[in-house]
Amino acid sequence: ISNSEMTELCRAALWYSSDIEIVNTKLHGIKALRECNQVKLQGCDIISPEFGWFVHQIEMRDCTIQSEYFMMRSDHLIFTNLQMKGKYSFQYIEDSVLEHCVFDTKDAFWHAKNVVIRDSIVKGEYLAWYCENVTFENCKIIGTQPLCYCIGLKLINCEMVDTDLCFEKSEVEAVICTSVVSINLLV
């Protein structure tokens, strides 16, 4: 699919599909791309509240996204250079790598497992609660109460801006380049 437009009237575009490549396309339907396998997107504009649920093996590059519940319960995501705005994104994702992205989203990465976020900006409250084996490397993390109830959490060379009440009941190994407003040491 190339140089196309799927408007908001295209409610449930591309379900149960495999081996799809989508380039320079607008995906504006509410439930685009569900339960698909082996998907590549490049240069796409996505406005879809329930985009990418239960997707397996998706590569996304140079895309802009507005979504709620983005990529719910998906795995093997390889994302590069995304601009994303929304909430409740990346919940329950597994085995994924996200690089050179800007995410402005609350409640992101809840219950994520085996995920690496690298060279990115992640802005939003309640980041990555209940995650397991998630690594943030060379990232800027902005927002209240991030990274609570985590197991095997790693922060490598990260900045934390306006972050308070961090790391509640988390198992964390961190190298942080900035001060942190507060750390919640409740056990």
Where are the language model's segments positioned?
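Long, distal/terminal scaffolding or interaction modules
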Residues: I1-V187
